[in-house]
Swiss-Prot record:
UniProt KW keywords: Amino-acid biosynthesis, Aromatic amino acid biosynthesis, Lyase, Pyridoxal phosphate, Tryptophan biosynthesis
Organism field: Saccharolobus solfataricus (strain ATCC 35092 / DSM 1617 / JCM 11322 / P2) (Sulfolobus solfataricus)
Cofactor(s) listed in the protein's UniProt record: pyridoxal 5'-phosphate
Family: Belongs to the TrpB family.
Keyword match Lyase: yes
Function: The beta subunit is responsible for the synthesis of L-tryptophan from indole and L-serine.
Catalytic reaction list: (1S,2R)-1-C-(indol-3-yl)glycerol 3-phosphate + L-serine = D-glyceraldehyde 3-phosphate + L-tryptophan + H2O
Protein name in UniProt: Tryptophan synthase beta chain 2
Length: 429
């Protein structure tokens, strides 16, 4: 009998709750700071009221609204876990590799998991429209689809570099009915100020956040947060909750849980439901490894301090690993990894040594993406590729120890709309 490669969870077994890590953190999360006295009031105006309430929730588990659960099923949940057998063989059969395939959702990434919740709660507030930022376009396309499914209008502010480098995601958002604007944007006062200084400003996620918040505030919309904050991570934990059930189905318990970090929600969404069990037990056995871009090394070279999550400094300061809210990253193709900070909950766990952080260059990660594509037949997103080098390191560690290890990977998205970016780096086209 052939080895089981794909682990599916029946639709009627989809988890009915999100997981909230706040009650299980090793210490209380440092609260937001508001030096101006205006940022928290702004948040109350631009965030959906239920999202703001859930940001500070004390409950360990939060019921997923039926309307959101129904749409999870509609967009491809539960997603499968796939065993990367040929990659295992290439690495010497020292590790077993299981991929949580968030790329199987209709938008091709993990982002739809929280987009549906945010837009649903904005609709409950009778918002005129929603706004958000996007880098490579995965988050923007997810908000665009979520808005379509809840019959809402969406304005997406896309980092200018990606707006022109990744036109197909822009078209995807437009197909879902969203309006897409390059950021810095001439629709906002902050954007116009930046464009006056540099009409070809490449933009950044921090700037796009500022554009989206300002536009929502001045025009009666609600701002949809794409990462970093606890509520967004909570909404995305549907992936980790599914993965726990799937690993139990095959009698496997991961020794390592790995994934990439832009703002932190992708990795946290998979890892937190597993990590929460260990934090409550008082002993963390597994190794949790988060990877990022060496071109934007916030986890390895950043400082753990209070900083603004957006460039215009409109939002409250958060304690996180950061390389500075004014940082304008190089135009690397993994647009989702270009954010300057790391989610406060994940930052706390990194600072305590519970989660390890590693960075890899674009060139190294893209070479692994090509190898992975040849071996497994599936092309990862540029962001996702930054998790692949970890596997070789784990395989080498397992070889030295003589113990075969099991690795669970967040396969956060596919790269079928990023082939031009791969070609520029790998084939010099």
């Amino acid at each position: 009998m052939a080895m089981r490669i794909r682990i599916d969870l029946p639709q009627d077994e989809i988890p009915a709750q999100w997981y909230n890590i706040l009650p299980d953190l090793p210490e209380e999360l440092p609260p937001p700071q508001d030096p101006t006295g205006k940022s928290l009031e702004l948040l109350k105006e631009v965030l959906p009221s239920k999202v703001l309430e859930l940001e500070f929730a004390k409950e360990r588990y939060v019921k997923i609204p039926d309307e959101v659960l129904e749409r999870y099923l509609q967009v491809g949940r539960p997603t499968p876990i796939i065993r990367a057998k040929r990659l295992e063989e290439y690495l010497g059969n020292n590790i077993k590799i299981y991929l949580k395939m968030e790329s199987y959702t209709y938008t091709g990434s993990h982002k739809i998991n929280s987009a549906l919740a945010h837009v649903y709660y904005a609709k409950l507030d009778n918002a005129k429209f929603v706004t958000t930022e996007t880098g490579a376009g995965q988050w923007g396309s997810s908000v665009a689809l979520a808005s379509a499914l809840f019959r809402m209008k969406a304005h997406i502010f896309m980092v200018r570099t990606s707006y022109y480098a990744k036109p197909y995601r822009k078209y995807m958002m437009q197909m879902y009915g969203a309006e897409v604007h390059p950021s810095p944007s001439d629709l906002t006062e902050f954007g116009r100020q930046l464009l006056a200084k540099d009409s070809n400003h490449p933009g950044s996620l921090g700037i796009a956040i500022s554009d989206a918040v300002e536009y929502a505030h001045k025009n009666g919309g609600k701002y949809v947060v794409g990462s970093v904050v606890n509520s967004d991570i909570m909404f995305k934990t549907i992936a980790g909750m599914e993965a726990k059930k799937q690993m139990e189905l095959i009698g496997e318990d991961p020794d390592y849980i790995i994934g990439v970090v832009g703002g932190g929600s992708n990795y946290a969404a998979l890892a937190y439901p597993f990590l929460g069990d260990e934090l409550r037990s008082g002993k963390v056995r597994r190794k949790y490894i988060a990877s990022g871009s060496s071109e934007v090394p916030k986890m390895t070279k950043g400082v753990y301090k209070y900083d603004y999550p957006d460039t215009a400094k409109l939002l409250p300061m958060l304690k996180m690993y950061t390389i500075g809210s004014d940082f304008v990253p190089p135009p690397v193709y993994a647009g989702g990894l270009r954010y300057h900070g790391v989610a406060p909950t994940l930052s706390l766990l990194i600072s305590k040594g519970i989660v390890q952080a590693r960075d890899y260059s674009q060139e190294e990660s893209f070479k692994w993406a090509k190898l992975f594509s040849e071996l497994e037949g599936y092309i990862p997103a540029p962001e996702t590729s930054h998790a692949l080098p970890i596997l070789a390191e784990i395989a080498e560690e397992a070889k030295k120890s003589g113990e075969r290890k099991t690795v669970l990977v967040s396969f956060s998205g596919h790269g079928l709309l990023d082939l031009g970016n791969y070609a520029s780096v790998l084939f010099k086209e």
